[in-house]
Amino acid sequence: MKRRFMALCLAGSMLLMTALTGCQRAAEQANEGQENAGQKNVEQTERTEMETLVVPEPVSMEDNYRTYYEVFVYSFYDGNGDGIGDLKGLTKKLDYINDGDPVTMDDLGCNGIWLMPVMPSPTYHKYDTTDYYSIDPEYGTMEDFEAFLSACRERGIKVIMDLALNHTSSEHPWFQEACSYLKELGDGEPDPGECPYVLYYNFSKEKKSGFSPVKGSDIWYYEAQFWDGMPDLNLYNEELRAEIEKIADFWLAKGVGGFRLDAAKEYVTGADGSNIEILSWFNDVVKEKYPDAYLVAEVFSDMAVYEKYYDSGIDSLFDFDFANKDGIIAKVVKGNTPASFYSQRLQEIEGIFSAHNKDYIDAPFYTNHDMGRSAGYYAGEGSEAQTKLAGAMNLMMSGSAFIYYGEELGMKGSGKDENKRAPMYFSSDPSAEGMCRGPSDMDDFEMKFGSYEEQKDDPSSVYQYYKKAVYYRNLYPEIRKGTVNDLPE
């Protein structure tokens, strides 16, 4: 049920008042030199907030309006001391994300986790899998994954997995068998009865744009739009579709709450209509057996393109127009666009999206693993306040909002992809327990704000600001589920 979005104004005002109060308190302490008295005031304020805390109502596992935390397991928390994040480490740090106790304010309060790929892969990012039914040994075992899911259920956290259906690894057995068959076949015509996997991919005797040569053959080529290590799948093949149905059922039966669908705009290169049909097929397959599963697709483009993908019936599409350094949020925060445009656009998208799917759930996000970290969008005096405001603007949008790990700490990282996936900044000591070494090609750079250890007890920190924004989002369902209206001046 849609409700008027009055809570947006209330919660937004509270957040801004908190920021202003924090700045004013710091200034007064500096001017008057009353450090002890200032500390006493801070402690008293924190006690008062805790004593008057209103506990948010729990969100049922069937409710797909949530606040998701995107986790790159490789860089989050190391549970076995090898320098690489893993599922045991993530499970150990779940209390950081959500401790399952709504009365406490020690956790961030997110009630959803988007798990970046965890299936076996030859790359550090793992978007090119070699096995859709297993866990990458770097991350642990299937038992570790099941223990993680169980711990999430206890805390009311819904877990969605990254599912890359556009391509596999070139080391996947399907692709390896198909290539071996074609090399032996030579210039003949492939028979799927002899090797069904030749129709799982897009092979051709003609070298087209985005096609790479089959190694060991001077006749055959295969489509690989991203790079030759990621051969594109032929998602119109019925045998492959049957396999994908089994893959989805395998994970959903284990208790996974849904999927983030990678690169949906690339399923069929340059063919939005075909991609929408494929999304519609997958959505129908999943929802027939798991009606409460949550599906959100990545259509990396502008709104004029991705709005059409709601015709598929999918729950959510990432709202790219508001994200990144040139998105609506950053433009408003920098003062390059009037603040009224933010409200205006929120109202406009309700009509735009609902015209395609009346049951849509918006998926606002501010940055992710493919974008520069948001703390780098702002510089100079006031940049901390800008970082906070931008985070709050994302979290005040309706739908299921997404936070990329470390954004709540104001982590930095730009340029090459590895820099955007740096180790979670739990501690400024890289040798501290659980700290990850990060991707091997990551540059050396310093963070802009303090680590979690340094921010957690500072009431005016970026972390505390994010935590309060998530709290208000949890407290007022109108923020997640409401519509937007301008208030009269």
What spans do the regions from the language model cover?
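Bacterial N-terminal signal peptides that target proteins for export
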Residues: 1-9
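Hydrophobic helical h-region of N-terminal Sec-dependent signal peptides
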Residues: 10-16
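Acidic/aromatic-lined carbohydrate-recognition and catalytic surfaces
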Residues: 23-26, 46-242, 253, 260, ...
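Asparagine/serine/threonine-enriched low-complexity, disordered tracts
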Residues: 25-26, 30-31, 36, 41
